[in-house]
C-alpha cells in the first residue's frame, strides 16, 4: 500500500497502481480516453493530466499524465489545479477539431465516454472553424457499424483487438493526425470477440449494427441483470428492451467470470427472442393446423390428457432453468423424469460432476484461468464450445511477459514496456484436437489425432507425472516423446490448468484430464481443472437430476409402453436423436405436450404447445461450468405491450398444470417459493438461494429500477392503442420494478446491477463506480454462489485407457463445432445466420480418394432417416478413418457423434 495526497486529502492506495487507477478506485473523477482497465496504459491521449508536487511545500508542481505515473508513497497531486483543468479542457478541444459533432444522430449518444469526458472537462464551445478531416467508412460485417469520422485516435480498438484478443485483421494506418482504424479492405471482422469494440471504443466509431435496425437511446431502454444463455461459461449480461423487443445486449461486469468482455455469439445472438414465429399463445393441434386457445382451456385440456394417459413421463433440458426442470420433475415424478440429452453426453456430464465434487482439484473461474502458467487442453475446441475461455487463455499465455516484468521491477500497467520485455515469450499452451484451432497462433505444441489417441497421450502424461497413475504400455515412440515433453512443461509450472469437456463425447478424455490434474496436485502444485459443458445449464441439470436417465431411455420406454403422455420443456428432440426414431416414438404417444419459447420440430408434432418465456421474459437460475449458480432476471413483461401474448415461465405452466391436474392450490406462486423448494429437495443445490437476493430486497426502502431515471415515453408509448395510461407490470418474483421508480445508481452496494450508470458516467466506463477497485470485483461482491468447491477428497486413478484408434471401412463421425450456428438458440437469430459459414463435410485426402470424392464437390449421405448433401473440404490434419461434420447445424443431430458412415457418395448438383 502507498499513501498519496490528492488535493490536500490523504488516501491509502495500492502502490502497484498508476495514479489514474488509484484515483478512479477512490471514486475521484479524472477524465481519460486511451486507458482501459483491461488494456493498461500507453499515454496516447494526454487527457488524464494532473498536477504533481515534489512535497507538501511545493506550490508550483508540474503536469504529469496520471495513467503513466506510479502511485508511490508520499505522492502529492492535484486534480482540481487550474492549470491541470485548463490543460484537460484543451486536450478535449483538440480531440474535437476533426470530430463531426453529430451527437444527435450518433448511436453512441447518451452512452458515450467522449460525451462524458467533454462535459467533465468543461469544454462547451467550439472555436475551430476550418475544414475537418474526413474518412470513408468500411463494411465490417453484420455485427458492427463503422464511422471513422468520429475517431479521436485513442488506439483502444487496435490495442484490444490485436494485443488483447489476438485479432489480425484490424489495424491502424496513416501518420500524425491523419490515421485510420479499420481493415485493409472491407470485410467481416474475423475475431470471435469483435463485438467488444462497441464498448471499448470511447466514441461512436464502432457501434452495434444489430441495435441500429431498432435503435433507441440507452436511457429509453429497460434492463435487468441476466446471464448469457449461449454456452456453459455463464457470462453476465445486461439485455436492453424497448416496445416489447430485445434491442441489444451489453456486458455486465463480473470480477470472476467475464470481466469487461463477451464473445460475439453471446453479444449478438439474442435475435431468437424477437422471432415472429415464436409461440405466444397456447396452441392446440387440429389436423395439420395449430389453433390458438385460452390459458384455462389449455390447462384443462392438458390436465385431461395427462389424467387419461396410462403413464406420464417428462423430458427436461440443459437450456432450461433449474426451476423449470425441477417443476417438471415434481409433476411427473423422479422416476419418470429424463434429462433430454443423448446418453454419451449425459455420461460425460455425470462424470464431470463426479470429478468436480470429489476430485480434490479446484475448478478455476475465468480470472483464475488467466493466472495459469501452463495449460493443457484435451480434445475441447474451447473457441467454439466456450469462446470466452479462449480469450482468457490468450491472457494466460502472456503471463510470461508479466513474470519477466516483475523480475525487472516494471509496473504491469506499463503495457508497452511489458510487451517489449516479453518479446513474444509465452507460457506453454498445449492442445490436442482433431484439426487446427483458432488458438494455434499462441500454442506451444499440439497433437492432431482421434479422440482415443488424444486420451492415450493424456493418460501417459499423468503416468509420467506420477508413476502411480496407470501407464499406457503400447504408446508409440513419437507420442511417448511428446508425452515426456508435455509432462515436463506441466510439472515445471506453478499453476497448471487442465481443460477438457463433453463436446467430444469421450469419457476417456475427461478421465485422462482428471488423472493429470490429480498427478499435478500430488506434486504440490496449484493445479486446477476446468470441465466444459455443452449448454447453459448442463451442470445444473446434472446436479438436479444426477440419477435420472438420458434421452435414449425415454425413447426406449415410449417404444415399449402404450398410451404414454410426454411433457417436454425447452427441448427439441430432433436436435438430439435420429429423426426416424423420434418420429416413431412420438407417433406412439397418446399425448405430446411441449412447453417451449421456440417453434421447434418437436413443437410442430405436439398435440398442445404451451408458450414458455424466453430468458428475457422470465427469472431463473443456471449453474455454469465452474459450479456457480447465477440468477437471471426478467427484463420485460410481454403482456404489458400486448394482452394477447400469453407466455409464461416454464415452471409457472407446470405448477398451474399440476394444480389443475390434482384439483389443488398452486404449490408455488412466486419464484422465491419454487427456488426454496428446489434447494430444499436437492442437497447439491442447498445454497443456490444465495445466488441472488429474494423479492423482498429493498434499498433505502425502495425496490430497484429496471429503467434509467431519464426513461421517456412510458405514458405515451401505447397511446395509439388506448389513451388511458396502463398500470406498469407488477413483479412478485424479484426486487425490481418495471419502471424508473426505485433505486438506481452506484452509491449503495448491490451485486445485481441492471445497467451501468453513475452521475457523470453514462458509458460502460461507469462500472468503475461499482467496483472495490478499478478492474477488481464489485463492491457488493460478484453475483452468484459457487456450489462446488474442492475438498480434501482424492479420486482413484481412472484406468480405462482406450485402445489406439483403428480405421475401418466406415468412417467415424466427429464434431467440427461451430461458434456461429452450433448452438441451438443463437442459430435461429438472423444476424448469426448471416455470420455462419457454409456447412461442410471434412475428410482426410486419403479417405476422399477411397470414396472417389473431390474437394468442393457435393457429398451425399444418410443417417437416421435424414439425407444430407454437403460440400467437401479436405484436411490433412484430420486423421484417416474420421469424417468431420458440424453437428447441430443443417439439421445434423448431436446423436451422430461417433456414429459410422459407410455410404458417402458424390452428389450431382
From Swiss-Prot:
[4Fe-4S] cluster 2 binds at residues 151, 154, 157, 201. One of its GO terms (molecular function) is metal ion binding. CDD domains: fer2, MopB_CT_NDH-1_NuoG2-N7, MopB_NDH-1_NuoG2-N7. Residues 1-83 form the 2Fe-2S ferredoxin-type domain. [4Fe-4S] cluster 3 binds at residues 228, 231, 235, 263. The keyword Metal-binding applies. Its EC number is 7.1.1.-. GO terms for biological process: ATP synthesis coupled electron transport; respiratory electron transport chain. Residues 83-122 form the 4Fe-4S His(Cys)3-ligated-type domain. Binds 1 [2Fe-2S] cluster per subunit. Residues 221-277 form the 4Fe-4S Mo/W bis-MGD-type domain. It catalyses: a quinone + NADH + 5 H(+)(in) = a quinol + NAD(+) + 4 H(+)(out). Keywords: 2Fe-2S, 4Fe-4S, Iron, Iron-sulfur, Metal-binding, NAD, Quinone, Translocase, Ubiquinone. [4Fe-4S] cluster 1 binds at residues 99, 103, 106, 112. The keyword 4Fe-4S applies. [2Fe-2S] cluster binds at residues 34, 45, 48, 67. GO terms for cellular component: membrane. Composed of 13 different subunits. Subunits NuoCD, E, F, and G constitute the peripheral sector of the complex. NDH-1 shuttles electrons from NADH, via FMN and iron-sulfur (Fe-S) centers, to quinones in the respiratory chain. The immediate electron acceptor for the enzyme in this species is believed to be ubiquinone. Couples the redox reaction to proton translocation (for every two electrons transferred, four hydrogen ions are translocated across the cytoplasmic membrane), and thus conserves the redox energy in a proton gradient. Belongs to the complex I 75 kDa subunit family. This is NADH-quinone oxidoreductase subunit G. It comes from Shewanella oneidensis (strain ATCC 700550 / JCM 31522 / CIP 106686 / LMG 19005 / NCIMB 14063 / MR-1). The gene is nuoG.
